[in-house]
Amino acid sequence: MYQDLIRNELNEAAETLANFLKDDANIHAIQRAAVLLADSFKAGGKVLSCGNGGSHCDAMHFAEELTGRYRENRPGYPAIAISDVSHISCVSNDFGYDYIFSRYVEAVGREGDVLLGISTSGNSGNVIKAIAAAREKGMKVITLTGKDGGKMAGTADIEIRVPHFGYADRIQEIHIKVIHILIQLIEKEMVK
């Protein structure tokens, strides 16, 4: 009944991954991002992560597997997803939704910390403002984007971009793979 649809969806997902893998710059960017994050942790820094909708869930997933665990038991790493509902509702009400992440970065971000900003379009105003706030604090910035990188293109120390111009879910599928690989590489870097 739906077998053709299922095959088409899985084939499109595989094609998106294959296109991402064709560009060696993506592989190098993932490696550089993992080293940057591990170096921050080793120096006493932390990572703040943010995004909207599914990207917000990815930001929380990233932080959870750093503070909790991924595949093996090991010490937790300092990671915070900007996801506190009382903070988000307060800032949305008092300043506007575009400031929900930047106000948090201003409050807890420090030089030597890292911001991971996630946006499938690269055009999320609140993530863009968080990047600006991170820069003001002397933080490093890693972005996970899609399409052509949108307004976030060129704003990060390291951008990992999924060059897919279709639906956002295909970009998110690659983002979660990248997140898992980042965690795996961070774990290896932390025991060096």
Curated annotation (Swiss-Prot):
- The protein's organism comes out as Salmonella typhimurium (strain LT2 / SGSC1412 / ATCC 700720)
Gene3D superfamilies in UniProt: Glucose-6-phosphate isomerase like protein, domain 1 (3.40.50.10490)
Q: How is the cofactor bound?
A: Binds 1 zinc ion per subunit.
Q: How does it assemble?
A: Homotetramer.
Q: Which PROSITE patterns match?
A: SIS
Main localization of the protein described in the UniProt heading: cytoplasm
Q: What is this protein called?
A: Phosphoheptose isomerase
Note from the entry: The reaction produces a racemic mixture of D-glycero-alpha-D-manno-heptose 7-phosphate and D-glycero-beta-D-manno-heptose 7-phosphate.
Annotated binding of substrate, by residue? N52, G53, G54, E65, N93, D94, S119, T120, S121, S124, Q172
List the GO terms this entry assigns under cellular component, sorted alphabetically. cytosol
The cofactor required is: Zn(2+)
Its annotated pathway reads: Carbohydrate biosynthesis; D-glycero-D-manno-heptose 7-phosphate biosynthesis; D-glycero-alpha-D-manno-heptose 7-phosphate and D-glycero-beta-D-manno-heptose 7-phosphate from sedoheptulose 7-phosphate: step 1/1; Bacterial outer membrane biogenesis; LPS core biosynthesis
Name the chemical reaction catalysed here.
2 D-sedoheptulose 7-phosphate = D-glycero-alpha-D-manno-heptose 7-phosphate + D-glycero-beta-D-manno-heptose 7-phosphate
Which keywords does this chain's UniProt record carry? Carbohydrate metabolism, Cytoplasm, Isomerase, Lipopolysaccharide biosynthesis, Metal-binding, Zinc
The residues that the entry says bind Zn(2+) are: H61, E65, Q172, H180
The record's family statement is: Belongs to the SIS family. GmhA subfamily.
What the protein does comes down to: Catalyzes the isomerization of sedoheptulose 7-phosphate in D-glycero-D-manno-heptose 7-phosphate.
Q: Which Pfam families match?
A: SIS_2 (PF13580)
Q: Which residues form the SIS domain?
A: 37-192
Q: What are its GO biological-process terms?
A: D-glycero-D-manno-heptose 7-phosphate biosynthetic process; lipopolysaccharide core region biosynthetic process
Q: Does the keyword section mention Zinc?
A: yes
- Under Enzyme Commission nomenclature, its number is 5.3.1.28
